């Protein structure tokens, strides 16, 4: 009986650790609502978006995605 319990506990811990690793891999992105113009990466807006995300939003940075400024949280 103890072996079965120990095996179940080990399996549960492995599943729990695997779930945490998967949760950490998914990047956090949020749209910057303060960036009013269309965000076009080739026009220099990428740097403005990054700066705006860092300065105004307090995020880690940002970039243009689908003409929207998206911040990394």
UniProtKB/Swiss-Prot annotation:
Keyword field: Disulfide bond, Knottin, Nodulation, Secreted, Signal
Annotated disulfide bonds: 39-64, 49-71, 53-73
> Hey, what's the signal peptide range on this chain?
1-23
**Subcellular location per the Swiss-Prot or TrEMBL entry:** Secreted
Q: Does the keyword Secreted apply?
A: yes
Gene Ontology cellular-component terms for this entry are: extracellular region
UniProt-listed GO biological process terms? defense response; nodulation
Which InterPro entries would you find in this protein's record? Scorpion_toxin-like
Highest taxon of the lineage: Eukaryota
Q: Main localisation, per the record?
A: secreted
Q: Which named protein is this?
A: Nodulin-1
Species assigned in the record: Medicago truncatula
